[in-house]
Amino acid sequence: MNSTLDSSPAPGLTISPTMDLVTWIYFSVTFLAMATCVGGMAGNSLVIWLLSCNGMQRSPFCVYVLNLAVADFLFLFCMASMLSLETGPLLIVNISAKIYEGMRRIKYFAYTAGLSLLTAISTQRCLSVLFPIWYKCHRPRHLSSVVSGALWALAFLMNFLASFFCVQFWHPNKHQCFKVDIVFNSLILGIFMPVMILTSTILFIRVRKNSLMQRRRPRRLYVVILTSILVFLTCSLPLGINWFLLYWVDVKRDVRLLYSCVSRFSSSLSSSANPVIYFLVGSQKSHRLQESLGAVLGRALRDEPEPEGRETPSTCTNDGV
């Protein structure tokens, strides 16, 4: 994470008069990113409320969705706070810089947690498709909760080490920071991303094959998973590249600034997209304006095949959270 210290603007940044076009693009993209963050926080807050406070029964996948919504909300909140500090008036620069650095570290924590949760979702569903009998009979009862807790702990540990060795306010150790940075980025780009891509590809092939053989639509749950992963890889991957590659590549400040802006907007879009995916996939054309949001969300996350010509029940089944 050492590479991220210089990859984005910070409070007190001054842009020279010769960068008028870059400045205009920067503020335009920043405005879009902030608007996306606000909408995404509202959507993820709704998902969190429906799954935790609305009395909805939760399946193992619902547990992952709840944790993912929390990670996305935290990421969007930190992103919006950072953008506000960059573009708003700075009354006390030192305090603003410390708040900015804190928000940035929490943002990395949320990003890592969200990435690892999506990887766990894809891996678990891939195993359920490849080994359905083993998965049904031998999966630990509280696997989803245990895995989610372990991934949050791993994300916290990784970002704590990065903060301890790399944050400028804590007298960073450049040598140790470099090692932590390599391990951190290797874990993200060398393990989580490849596993997510591999398992989601296998899942897509098997789901597509089964749908063609049985001549029926794939489960809504699989559509939700594959769409969410596709959006994440398309929109959030630029942020990971921004963290890792820009440190090794010598590029102009204008290019670095613009790429940082675009990667922020795309990652904000990714964290805001999941609630939209849930409600689009879970809605039924004949009752699109008549159903409650809880019913739509429950149908999207239901881990059962949908009978042909019949409406699918809308509650998440509680099969061992």
Swiss-Prot record:
Q: Which residues lie on this side of the membrane: Cytoplasmic?
A: 30, 94-146, 203-220, 282-321
Main localisation:
membrane
Q: Which residues are glycosylated?
A: 2
Q: Where is the protein found, in the record's own terms?
A: Cell membrane
| Keyword field | Cell membrane, G-protein coupled receptor, Glycoprotein, Membrane, Receptor, Transducer, Transmembrane, Transmembrane helix
Q: Which Pfam families match?
A: 7tm_1
> What is a GO molecular function of this protein?
G protein-coupled peptide receptor activity
Q: Which top-level group of life is the source organism from?
A: Eukaryota
Q: Which CDD domains match?
A: 7tmA_MrgprD
Give the span(s) annotated as Disordered: 302-321
Q: Where are the transmembrane segments?
A: 9-29, 31-51, 73-93, 147-167, 182-202, 221-241, 261-281
Q: Function, please? A: May regulate nociceptor function and/or development, including the sensation or modulation of pain. Functions as a specific membrane receptor for beta-alanine. The receptor couples with G-protein G(q) and G(i).
Name the UniProt record assigns to this protein = Mas-related G-protein coupled receptor member D
Source organism of the structure: Mus musculus
Lineage, opening ranks: Eukaryota, Metazoa, Chordata, Craniata, Vertebrata
